[in-house]
Amino acid sequence: MKSYPLLSTIDQPADLRGLSRAELKQLAQELRDHVLTSVSQTGGHLSSNLGTVELTIALHHVFNTPQDRLVWDVGHQTYPHKILTGRRDRMAGLRQLGGISGFPRRDESEYDTFGTAHSSTSISAALGMALAAKIKGEDRRSVAIIGDGAMTAGMAFEALNNAGVSGANMLVVLNDNDMSISPPVGALNRYFARLMSGRFYSAARQGAKSVLKNAPPLLELARRFEEHAKGMIVPSTIFEEFGFTYVGPIDGHDLDSLIPTLENLRDRKGPQFLHVVTKKGYGYKLAEADPVAYHGPGKFNPAEGLKKAAPGKPSFTQVFGQWLCDMAAKDTRLVGITPAMREGSGMVEFEQRFPDRYFDVGIAEQHAVTFAAGLACEGLKPVVAIYSTFLQRGYDQLIHDVAIQNLPVVFALDRAGIVGADGATHAGAYDIAYVRCVPHLSLIAPADENECRQALTAAFEQQHPVAVRYPRGAGVGVAVQSELTALPWGRGELRREARGGGRRIAILAFGTLLYPALAAAEKLDATVANMRFIKPLDTELVLSLARSHEALVTVEEGCLQGGAGSAVLEALQAAGVNLPVLTLGLPDEFVEHGDPAKLLAQLGLDAAGIEQSILKRFGAKLELVRPAING
């Protein structure tokens, strides 16, 4: 058990405000080690958290949290924040079922002022809090901490545009971990940051404006001179054009620079902008050398680092990546698009082999969808690789720019269904409902790896938009054919027929829950259909099973409201067929973080749960296997 002499005394941020600068530096070392040790034992986000240790300490040291509001963007870099705000001893349960979240949550701590996990929301939220304080007459500051990646999203600039003219007492901290500062430039920037953030500079600046306000040409000349002087040392003054006072860049790992600069900015009125430079993986050489590999590792030995995983069943993401390369080699019209998820979406090899047809548009899902529409208008065949949860951010574009124009865009929806440790914010629970209600837009839910490849091929062959949803992780181990063959369009298949005359129950499985449905059916002697297509639904198969069975059961890894089960009920109603239907899927609640298999079992969507739900609804096992009354 490691000993942390200083960290063990920090139960809340107030405990670190009396520490000396030397003690704060020691605290940073202990905090970084605790983050590394914790993540190595549970898995989680590592590189980003190692890079925010000093910044987190400085923010809690300078600002009176939780009275002052810290709003973290994305939130996967908040482990140091969690440790310093009373959750040090709960890190062993990080992202585990029943443990603390890997992201800020308002219901977890008063220091988590705003729940998040998607990017680019912090400035908007912090502005709302700052103006609320003004309306209520409360004396407090709001601070948004946002990364350079999240600054590529339009929402961040919408918020900057609004905040700059609001006069709100707020600070935006840009955590820039995609550049570095050489020591000489860093020293100069430290001096300049202190100068720009200090009271003398601010007072002199305002005084000069007052003197020159009656001489506009001189005022404009002075403004341009100031910008020219700053431009020799700092980046673009775009943020000042938004109405912010810009300070930086400064070294985000240097407490001697961070603390006095933040103290100066804390006492200034109006919108302030601080640019800090950090390094992902800082303090752990292996993560510094390969921050992508250590972005979200599983359990590992810090002394040895990550080990290459033994060959196993391919993941659905890998199946997609291979299909993308194979189809691109066959059809030169294919172009691949990702909103900043190259590794996560399995597009690394595609970028290497087809660089001119690969587009990473940054964290800009709205743009990604409409960009794909523009490509499709010119005869290309765009494939947008995007997590199910992130397509939600481009929903208007999906309808307005793609579906209404009936453009042939393929959406590869990764992370559909339960995602596990990332929890409710990343769950792909809603895509079935929000996709199937849109005209022109089709949706396929393959059951395994080979069907995923075939579904993507079928989608690519269409002349209208199609989404293919598949889960995170590996499939069941089905062999993947090398040929680019397509699923029969709009057709499901029977995978098991009841034996011994038992024709009472038919299970209609959508997606990867086919396999637990088959296992449950063996216990109940039920018929099982692999539906494959949610839209267009194979109504012929649905009605055939309805006429030959006494009850239907639908199974899906998506929300029940508006889901695949609802589609089956609508089809039966339209045909005037009336029989009992049990719909199984995700409940009307946000599913918490935890191991996916345990979560599915908890939700009754594993084989045992499906069996028990059917028995509970339709009776004892002996009754289920008796011949159907009207069979």
Curated annotation (Swiss-Prot):
Q: What Pfam families does this protein's entry cite?
A: DXP_synthase_N (PF13292), Transket_pyr (PF02779), Transketolase_C (PF02780)
Q: Which parts pass through the membrane? A: none
GO MF annotation terms: 1-deoxy-D-xylulose-5-phosphate synthase activity; magnesium ion binding; thiamine pyrophosphate binding
Known pathway: Metabolic intermediate biosynthesis; 1-deoxy-D-xylulose 5-phosphate biosynthesis; 1-deoxy-D-xylulose 5-phosphate from D-glyceraldehyde 3-phosphate and pyruvate: step 1/1
Q: What is a biological process (GO) this protein takes part in?
A: 1-deoxy-D-xylulose 5-phosphate biosynthetic process
Q: Which cofactor does it need?
A: Mg(2+); thiamine diphosphate
> Keyword set for this entry?
Isoprene biosynthesis, Magnesium, Metal-binding, Thiamine biosynthesis, Thiamine pyrophosphate, Transferase
Any single GO CC term annotated in Swiss-Prot or TrEMBL for this entry: cytosol
What NCBIfam families does the record tag this protein with? dxs, PRK05444.2-2
What protein name applies here?
Answer: 1-deoxy-D-xylulose-5-phosphate synthase
Q: Which organism is it from?
A: Methylibium petroleiphilum (strain ATCC BAA-1232 / LMG 22953 / PM1)
